[in-house]
Amino acid sequence: MSQWTHVIATFRAQGIDHPMFPQINWQNRMSKNVPHGSEGPLQIVVNVSRDFGRVDTVVTVWGDLRDYDDEAEIMTYFTSIIPTPQQGAFIGEGVVRIRIEECGDDPEREYHYKFVGDGQSGEWMSIKR
């Protein structure tokens, strides 16, 4: 019997659409070290909207990873793709939900992106389900 890990995630980033400010290449940023099961990696869709001098980006990630159960590696990936304001984007909201089949009493985890300290940076915080 196969081990399956199900992932659904989304986050929203805001930036300034002006040559003075750094612009993020989301496809390049997202494509490094993507968690990968025996039948393929997580799927990624990036939607970018430019209006009134702003860049609004919504990133959606999902997938069913076969023969994979490394929750820590998934969260390391999500931590690595979040930019800082100095890199060109401010993360408004984010959520990651991971469900590992046949994982005992606590197979499902949810993480929310929360701001810490100065409000310029944040981290993924586990929400007990």
Task: Describe the function of each predicted region.
Residues 27-129:
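Charged interaction segments
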Residues 1-29:
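Short, extreme N-terminal segment that most often corresponds to the first beta-strand
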